[in-house]
């Protein structure tokens, strides 16, 4: 076997006591040798197992980049470590190959000379050769020992630097006020977003499973370091319930890593698109108002800061929902401190369908807080219509996107104030907070003056008294006032599952659904509020398959049972789920008695 590539860095080995010898050429290594090499360089067993599972061999190492390492599940720290030790491996490998070739050439030359001498003095030269060989062997042994000692020292130094990486000054930027993130505590799960100069990834806490954070990785070479430091410090200084908070940061040679909470529900844009795909509309006006008011409060907080902070990219994609359905304004990558930059700030910003005219047309370099107000108005429309406010076709000559005629007068007033073409005539955040739309508990329809009640009013009554279902003209009533948990009602399936027509209760459930939906009236009463259930269920035809699959699934869960009222009870439980969804998303469908 060829001479060993490296001495052991420690007594602990991936293979235990039966440690293998690493040849000088790493391309000849099998998977076992690769794992041994990683072990010598203090890789964690869990990460070594990933190389073992993927059967990584020596000739693969040259081609393993970030994409493959991410797919294998290595953390940022381990990815950087791998790149560093592989670079060292290649350098050492080249040195050893060169020195070995020189040694072989020297030996071949000596052998030729010795052979010539042997023709003259066989006995003496044989003795001399033997002595020389012994001396050479001793020298080789000494050289090998010295090489081993040098390699041990190099590896010890390398391993020591790796262990201390999180505590070195390279991981710290004295200009940043935020705490340093212990990056080695997290493992990469998946990529969740990508921008021009940054990537957002989801990470899981290794010590606390199912605890996730988002990490925004910003390319230092592609972005100005000064701007990155400003973004981190700005985020860290902000303290508002509807603005994203920074957990910490980490820095290496190539990237800054900004850690924030992970919101599993995702963005407003994602949610509203999902709703539109099913109902051909966005959020109810009541829901839009509630979200908009909280985001406007966040905008007012930013604009009232000293110096003022302009977000410059407000849109549904940059508004997240937390577990309590509270909106969180995020992605401050385009933000700037207005006072420092208001004289010559000409950097392109904002998505075109949400951008203020003065930004899009580059008619001015004074990008004031009013550009956020325009984008805010576009975001209100986005939530209402379920897509970008221009329908994918913005006419740059138009002053504002079209406003739906069915909106209340109060909502139209806010949109008109936010979407004025000339920024000098746009309302500011404090003026908008005084708008009637953000104060009313009930809304007035613009077409006929009918009162539309907010979802909060109806939901409060629903939680307090439940519902009463009226079936037929003789006022058969089914009172569903038993103590129930709104959370359980809200967790009914939202998508129908497979329906087995051979299920023993299939026909009974189907006939029950058809029986009730064909009655007139088929109404639900929640205190003074009334909903036409027949109209609602006929309008949303998917409710039928959803009801049947959900009820059959719950029957299987509750079996065996002797309760003959189980199926009617489950049906009216489903009706309460329908009421819950209508209250949340379409409160305007209720009327008052």
Curated annotation (Swiss-Prot):
Belongs to the protein kinase superfamily. Ser/Thr protein kinase family. The lineage of its organism: Eukaryota, Amoebozoa, Evosea, Eumycetozoa, Dictyostelia. Its EC number is 2.7.11.1. It comes from Dictyostelium discoideum (Social amoeba). Residues 108-157 are annotated as: Disordered. This is Probable serine/threonine-protein kinase samkB. ATP binds at residues 192-200, 216. Residues 186-438 form the Protein kinase domain. Keywords: ATP-binding, Kinase, Nucleotide-binding, Serine/threonine-protein kinase, Transferase. It is an enzyme of class 2 (transferase). It catalyses: L-seryl-[protein] + ATP = O-phospho-L-seryl-[protein] + ADP + H(+); L-threonyl-[protein] + ATP = O-phospho-L-threonyl-[protein] + ADP + H(+). One of its GO terms (molecular function) is protein serine/threonine kinase activity. InterPro entries: Kinase-like_dom_sf, MAP_kinase_kinase_kinase, Prot_kinase_dom, SAM, SAM/pointed_sf, Ser/Thr_kinase_AS. Residues 113-153 have a biased composition (Low complexity). Residues 29-93 form the SAM domain. The active site is at 313 (proton acceptor).
